[in-house]
Amino acid sequence: MNMQWLNDLLFGVGVGHSILLVAVTIALGIWLGKIKIFGISLGVTFVLFVGIVLGHFGMNLHPDVHHFFKEFGLILFVYSVGMQVGPGFFSSLRKGGLTLNLLAMGVVFLGVLTTVILHFVTGISMSTMVGILSGAVTNTPGLGAAEQTFHDLTGTGDPTITLGYAVAYPLGVVGIIASMLIVRAIFKISVAKEKEKMDSLEHNDDNQAIALSLVVKNPAVFSKTLAEVRQLLKGHDYVISRTMDSRTNSISLAHSDTVLNENDRVFVITNPQNTAVISSFIGTEVQMDRKQWIPTESHLVSRRFIVTKSELNGKTLGSLQLRKMHGMNVTRVNRAGVEMVALASLPLQVGDRLTVVGSELVMPKVEELIGNSVKRLNEPNLMSIFIGIGLGILLGSLPIVLPGIPQPVKLGLAGGPLVVAILLSRFGYRYKLVTYTTPSANLMLREIGITIFLACVGLGAGEGFVDTIVNKGGFTWIGYGFIITLLPLLIIGFIACKGYKINYLTLMGMLAGSTTDPPALAYANNTTNHDAPAVGYATVYPLTMFLRVLTAQLLILFFCS
């Protein structure tokens, strides 16, 4: 029997061989990544090392297929990260984004300083050192920028740039993860406690919706309608959903013409920054369970409905006219796990969960209006994903010309899609784009992307890996790369924990983002089921990517011209 087909499949250069090789690399890597060494497992990061081993034994991809797979995998990964963190990205940026970006800049510039010092101490050419630097911080666009700049300056290429990158990259990944573990050990950090702190901070977020039960005590609001009270409290975000008559203790749905009397009680939804003003203006707070606002004999019920009709995407809550048409009040809106005050001006997005209070008889009509179809929500919105990827590639390819630098700087195929994903997931509703993706679909997209990327990086680096280490001084290059990786991260990690009291979950994301390292983010995500690492990563990634590319070009320009 002719077995040539099997030989071609296993050792050829065709499409089937490439797909099979990537699949085997990923499967083996994920399986071996579950093994714990000293209680630590590398997870999907192990795919990289399986790729290096297979690449060393001659299992290679066709160069064009390799390049496509690697870039497409990276794009899928960063785009899904952007979609995940987008809804909460800008509030996070306002609260701690400046500090995180300054710390990330510190990592970048300490890495550059370490590289320059090693260049003068060891005598290794700067072109090689820039390759080692790019590998040590796992930054492929920086490598590409350095190679292009060197070629433009000299008219020839320098293979040691790529070799330096290849030998430093694997230990770079390990070093970034090691820095997280070392910081955790030094400060005796409990991941569970850090998660509790993060949950507590999110609960006290200025945008979070909180419920108050108030007794009307201010004479200024006696005999006033809720519409008149709203005018007096203009500029403050709140919703009064129900009132309790002080004489009969009967509970009613609040309307704009509802009149407040002394000792009436009101159920208010607001945010922490408005709590004091509203409480002091209306009266005094009393402790009442939410269930007391819906007594068993009442006709009022509370239901949660999911916005699933795409035609509602971008429409304001007030435009639904639920109170006017159906006598219903929306008290809270939950978006991506964040509770928000149900203001009439709030734009709705597919996937929002509305808490609606009103008559049980009218609930089916409201459900029909909003959608509330989990089946529809599970349908993937592929069009918006690929529109976003396309726009991201355009943005990433846009040359940014800076004074005094002959070569334009670009965000690259990773930075562009990340920025666009963040913007679309936050503002896509304004352009009628449904960007909602179920958490499971987003996770699938993210894991497929990162594993394909790691498999390709490993297979590409494996071919000359051992030769470089044994015959070309690669052992010392690995050591220098590890210093460039570890030293800046430990210094900034210490400053972040000791000086700025940065939450460890956010710190992991910031350290991964400051080195533009997807495997480290994957490790951080596996450490906790919180999205704080992804938010920290996305907060610093765009600026870091820009600086990594810029500094790689500047080092070549200043030292190799």
Swiss-Prot record:
Keywords: Cell membrane, Membrane, Repeat, Transmembrane, Transmembrane helix, Transport
Keyword presence, Oxidoreductase: no
Source species, domain of life: Bacteria
Membrane topology value: Multi-pass membrane protein
SUPFAM superfamilies reported for this sequence: TrkA C-terminal domain-like (SSF116726)
InterPro entries: AAE_transporter, RCK_C, RCK_C_sf, YidE_YbjL
Protein name per its UniProtKB record: Uncharacterized transporter PG_1411
Cellular compartment(s): Cell membrane
Domain RCK C-terminal: start-end pairs: 196-284, 286-372
NCBIfam families: PRK03818.1, YidE_YbjL_dupl
Pfam families: Asp-Al_Ex, TrkA_C
Any GO CC annotation of this UniProt entry: plasma membrane
Family recorded in the similarity comment: Belongs to the AAE transporter (TC 2.A.81) family.
UniProt signal peptide: none
Membrane found in the keyword field: yes
Gene Ontology terms: biological process: potassium ion transport
Spans traversing the lipid bilayer: 10-32, 37-59, 74-93, 100-122, 161-183, 384-406, 411-430, 443-465, 475-497, 504-523, 538-560
An MF annotation (GO) of this entry: monoatomic cation transmembrane transporter activity
